[in-house]
A protein has these predicted regions:
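N-terminal capping segment at the start of a domain
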Residues: 1-23, 114, 140, 297, ...
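Zn-dependent metallopeptidase/amidohydrolase metal-coordination segment
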Residues: 4-6, 69-70, 325-375, 379, ...
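Active-site-adjacent substrate-binding region
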Residues: 7-8, 149-197, 235-239, 300-352
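A non-catalytic alpha/beta surface segment that caps or lines the substrate-entry region
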Residues: 10-57
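A short beta-alpha structural unit
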Residues: 18-22, 250-260, 270-277, 294-311, ...
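A generic, well-ordered mixed alpha/beta core segment in the N-terminal half of proteins
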Residues: 76-147
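Midchain, well-structured core segments that form catalytic/ion-binding scaffolds
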Residues: 115-116, 122-280
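His/Asp/Glu-rich mid-to-C-terminal helical/loop segments that flank catalytic regions of hydrolases
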Residues: 215, 219-244, 351-389
Length: 389
């Protein structure tokens, strides 16, 4: 199924993807999702926050269901598997169950959460954060992309109703359990399929380094107030201090004003991604780097530990050759973490990534491992929903 969408939002020069939320590529992917649901006779709809749902069964009659799926948006120049693998595998797992004549005792849904990556508006997992009430709807509406368009304006242009954004208890009540399949984003998984134990705490911060614009040639060094130097020191310190604290820190995005080759900048704005196994160490790192800059926390996701009973059960069901699937933590953020923090029983399946490359065109998973992921997911869905042939 991934072949159906492999050209949507793809850069023909690099092979990477640009699938920003609510872009033309995203709208095309939404149509693909709805079409896949209709092909299978699933009842699909878009909730008030832009998340997509496709139901096998009726949760309003049968009670809360088991939801699987992921997201379809990407980071800039992202890979083909991060997100779409989970959505495609969810549809294929349903196909596998139906092919075996399986009839679940509770509803099953495929979900596609909007703007998981946060590439356009700067906040990750916007759809699931709004759904669960973690993200204030007024703040969400005011978020702006690089062109200055607010989320409110973008949603209105797409025919949505931004005034309806916010916690959606009606939709949440339909979700009894959530199981997200995702490509592993490192090299820690040696088996074809694994299970997540926890998600590291992580956040994004905007650093504003201020200076004074001036001529690059005529301004003596002793007369300069150059914010680029402060930024450069922060980049080096981020690496040094992160290693000392045992965490990860990355300045991956930067904006310079006025951005002239022959002028000292007046402002350097950079975005820091920091994450690690312990909250205190991540926050200590950010505090140490904050000297000389105005720092704004744009998002924060606390540590998530997945339900031990559920993850153990999932590992046993998803294992191959009679052995439980390996259980491992992840440093990557996911919608599964947002739902788990909101009290939804949640588990994650990982599909092996042989290179460990992610958020880049080189992201990859072997076809046979993807098949193993579908088989494992189908087994988990069958186990958690009961029913039979």
């Amino acid at each position: 199924m991934l072949a159906d969408i492999e050209q949507i939002g793809r850069n023909p020069r690099t092979g990477g993807y640009r699938r920003d939320a609510w872009s033309s590529a995203d709208m095309e992917l939404r149509e693909w999702f709805t079409h896949q649901a209709a092909k299978r006779g699933l009842t699909s709809h878009e909730d008030r926050n832009g998340n997509l749902w496709a139901w096998w069964g009726d949760p309003s009659v049968q009670g809360p269901g088991l939801v699987t799926g992921s997201h379809l948006d990407s980071v800039r120049e992202g890979g083909a598997f991060d997100g779409p693998l989970g959505v495609a595998s969810a549809f294929e797992a349903i196909d596998l169950l139906r092919g075996d004549g399986f009839q679940p005792d509770r509803p099953i849904a495929v979900a596609c959460f909007t703007d998981e990556e946060g590439a356009r508006f700067g906040v990750p997992c916007i759809g699931s954060r709004l759904l669960t009430g973690v993200l204030d709807p007024d703040r969400a509406r005011s978020l702006r992309d690089e062109q200055g368009h607010s989320l409110d304006e973008v949603l209105t242009a797409r025919g949505r109703q931004p005034g309806r954004l916010g916690r959606d208890d009606e939709t949440l009540a339909r979700v009894g359990v959530f199981v997200e399949l995702h490509v592993e984003q490192g090299r820690a998984l040696e088996a074809p399929v694994g299970v997540a134990s926890a998600i590291w705490p992580h956040g994004r911060w905007r650093f504003d380094f201020r200076g004074t614009a001036d001529h690059a040639g005529t301004t003596a060094f002793e007369d300069r107030d150059d914010p680029m130097l402060a930024y450069a020191h922060a980049v080096l310190a981020a690496r040094t201090q992160a290693e000392a604290h045992g965490v990860r820190a990355t300045f991956g995005k930067v904006r310079v004003e006025p951005n002239n080759a022959n002028a000292i900048p007046s402002l350097v704005t950079a975005w820091l991604d920091a994450r690690g196994p312990e909250t205190e160490k991540v926050r200590a790192l950010v505090t140490e780097l904050a000297a000389g800059a105005d720092v704004t926390e744009e998002s924060w996701t606390p540590e998530v530990t997945f339900d031990e009973v559920l993850r153990t059960r999932v590992a046993c069901v998803a294992g191959l050759d009679g052995h439980p699937a390996p259980i491992l933590p992840t440093a990557a953020g996911h919608d599964a973490g947002i739902l788990a923090s909101a009290g939804v029983p949640t588990a994650m399946l990982f599909v092996r990534n042989p290179t460990g490359v992610s958020h880049a065109p080189g992201e990859f998973a072997e076809p046979r491992d993807c098949v193993s992921g579908v088989i494992a997911l189908a087994a988990v869905l069958a186990d958690l929903t009961g029913g039979g042939s």
